[in-house]
């Protein structure tokens, strides 16, 4: 998740909770300059991702730029990269990036030809089921079946939905039937019961990509696997170490607080009756006020089946 699950989050999460089989970077946006920004470089440097499996995610509309970035990542030791065809942001799709590429299947095929022919690494893809209609998915599946995709992660909404409405599980059922690549489900797995419902309805599901649910409940992977539920003590340790890392890296008070407040948009969902302390967190202007508000929210019980509330 862009701006939340960065390298600090990944390192602290894997220390205190059941780690993900693979973490994905916030998307990197290679351009014709063929330079990674300092921020992008910090995200992917192997020394910043010790002890976890990391898959860099690329968002671009130029096959040569993708191939260049994949080559740079291969030189760092990465054997696999992820192509983001799922981002629905208007500023992204207007440039035919992310899910903006799905509406032009000729352009999509030309792009995929270029990256699969030119890249020396394995490529996984995250996609949506279409641009404006789920009826588009059958055609997209035919296209994806022509390439050696390492894994196809499907967010079961169309681009125009953004994150509104329910995921289209009939599209997931179709994907399980017709797609050749190994599949990964994505969409509204916000807590352990929602994962259980999906796996009960579609037991052939082999993988799930978590987003907002994991940001709200860092114990979610363990809970889905039958492990211990989220508890306040472990969550507080997670928060305190993450805060210390972010403070060391960011330094300045205002951007530090902005970063932590964004995280609390998700973490706050896992506490009962959290509206008042969350408001205090969001209104805090100093680190002292912020930490005082955080102490207050930790006096509230953690919700049973904690997770994101839409």
Regions found by a protein language model. Give the residues of each.
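Flavin-dependent oxidoreductase catalytic cores
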Residues: 1-310
